């Protein structure tokens, strides 16, 4: 501030700034998985992290899982989005597995605890059913029927899930109950809920239909965190304050299968529930305890460590990696063991549209910093889906203009096909010729690169060999090149282009066949005896001759634009004067000089003066800088000339070096 009386005011500023290098080896992948968050970006840094987050591969998810796994053999920063079909995918819940019932006639004079027996024809199948709620007149409002024995019998007689007319429910009343009729429907297979995005989870949990089912069966709202069959392996033990005090003598009912099991809460917790609104919650997965926590159904309640333990707040903040829950309509004093079921990944139902929606999460370059898109991970899908999705990802790359999209041919074009026919298929798919007029990859983009093969690879999780697209490996080669060399070096060739974990390739091409592929900007992948399996080309997906028709030049310019572009934002709202232009020119020239010294640039020039910042440009509040760059080029073609000469010939004279 301005001094109004004698004194000393100290001010500090700086005129120094620099261009900072940013990551160039972060990859992105969208695909189908059997577990994990849907339609949100998750960072994965290693294979263990991949398995824990998205589950192990299945036949339907292997292409995507193994593509992700393959990239992580080279790099260590992968961003993944899981795609699901919103209409069919389900989170496991305690609703599935219950018997749907209708209280056709509520009767009168019944009491809570009156027994209900489920019969098949004349045989007693389940004898532990009970009335759980009646009104003042003894009319039945709610019942509980364990389903474990009913499930087994229904499977045995071929009446699963719909229970036919042979199934009946009989009520044995100890309180002179009269005239009630309960009609049995089907064993519920639909969990009734999908939590796709975490921000919408609370709305899904408190939806009218889902809450009505919870109230009908008298169970709290606890579900698996993610959609998929793996949620069926989750079990939740919930213990009230009263039952916690009983220790192992508290026998907890198991929902919905039936039976009881002794509480283990005393052995797990040092401090249990302190009030009647608190519950000890133990989460098991595959019978192993993975989480234990005391939570409350009362808003604002805290634990002994003064931490907020309100159920809705705890789960909304991501308190569990396994379950999600709500306190709404939580049965007062509930104790029991919930076995979840009905989870569906529904990967067979995922469409090209679902995959494209997942890829759209990477469209904004300001919020998502990735440089390598593994679009070819979908190459195992149908010809139409593989072509459509990869084109969409290329359009994202073209719009971002800061990344490289790695694409692979659809599996049916190369796997199990003679090499000559496979090469024809690749060329026709690339050029929209022959039978590929509708489903093709007839694009031109310097922000994409196409490989021309698939690899046969061992799947250690299922003990089988699988055909896997190579796009993730090519992205991995780019990331590894950044680590062992520089971004502007080509990822192809014997020095940096070695592909890992290959049993064999789908096709082994010869020179003439590789020539055909390379002319259409398809980079061959080949294997020669003793030299490994190698990326044998570094073209981008364009037919326009330019410096950008090579991967190394494209990645060089992506890096330069990103790094210099981020530095330039600090000129926003500064004055467009000689000092600003000179400082920016000096700063960027120093950065480019460093790249030149490392071999990425042959020559460069930065123009940022009054020639491109004219008075009219300045009056429009604009700032212009132009960079002229001679990028380093990779060697694609080697010619070795051997000349025989006469004995005693003068080599200097023959080569024109004499005199």
Curated annotation (Swiss-Prot):
Gene3D superfamilies recorded: 2.40.10.380, 3.40.50.11780
Keywords of the record: Viral contractile tail ejection system, Viral genome ejection through host cell envelope, Viral penetration into host cytoplasm, Viral tail protein, Viral tail sheath protein, Virion, Virus entry into host cell
Localisation per UniProt entry: Virion
Location (main, coarse): virion
Any Gene Ontology CC annotation: virus tail, sheath
Entry keyword Glycoprotein: no
Any single GO BP term: symbiont genome ejection through host cell envelope, contractile tail mechanism
UniProt keyword Nucleotide-binding, yes or no: no
Homology family: Belongs to the myoviridae tail sheath protein family.
Description of how the protein assembles with itself and partners: Hexamer.
Role: Structural component of the bacteriophage tail which consists of a contractile sheath, a tube and a baseplate. The central cylindrical segment of the tail consists of a rigid tube, composed of multiple copies of gp19, surrounded by the outer contractile sheath assembled from gp18 subunits. A total of 138 copies of gp18 arranged into 23 hexameric rings constitutes the sheath. During infection, contraction of the sheath drives the central tube through the host outer membrane, creating a channel for DNA ejection from the capsid into the host cell.
Name listed for the protein in its UniProt record: Tail sheath protein
Organism listed in the record: Enterobacteria phage T4
